[in-house]
């Protein structure tokens, strides 16, 4: 995880996995994604009982945070694949969860397009955060 690379542009919106993984707890779950060659290509964390719970009408949500793709593996489909597999992963390991929420920086149009492609919807809500204004997006999971 120490060799994970992010560009300066990526670091405007996210953090290194090595920093985020230190927050791991029974409610903050780091997720690492590997390709077929066993290279770490994507990282994110899923958090229960999070600060964005008030921005959804669903009672059981996970917050998707710190999503990134190692710069050496950008534009190869790994981020899309990881997000498209997420509902099945959550159904298996968190069957009580009914939605996934995230906050994406309003200036990060690349990430917004990715999340939209993967069926996340703009909730219309905006939140002021450490690195700027966040657009709250949500993916409602079918049961």
Feature names for model-found ranges:
Residues 33-34, 135-139:
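Short beta-strand element of the conserved SAM-dependent methyltransferase core
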Residues 70-76, 106-107:
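Active-site acidic-Proline motif in GNAT/NAT acetyltransferases
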Residues 63, 68, 101-103, 136:
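Conserved beta-strand segments that form the floor/walls of ligand-binding pockets within enzyme
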Residues 80, 106-124:
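Conserved active-site alpha-helix within GNAT-family acetyltransferase domains
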Residues 96-112, 128-133, 140-141:
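Conserved beta-strand-loop-alpha-helix junction that forms the acyl-donor binding cleft
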Residues 77, 94-95, 119:
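Short glycine-rich hinge loops at helix-strand junctions in the catalytic core
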Residues 2-66, 70-72, 83-84, 89-93, ...:
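Acetyl-CoA-dependent GNAT
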Residues 47, 101-103, 123:
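Solvent-exposed beta-strand sheet faces enriched in polar/charged residues
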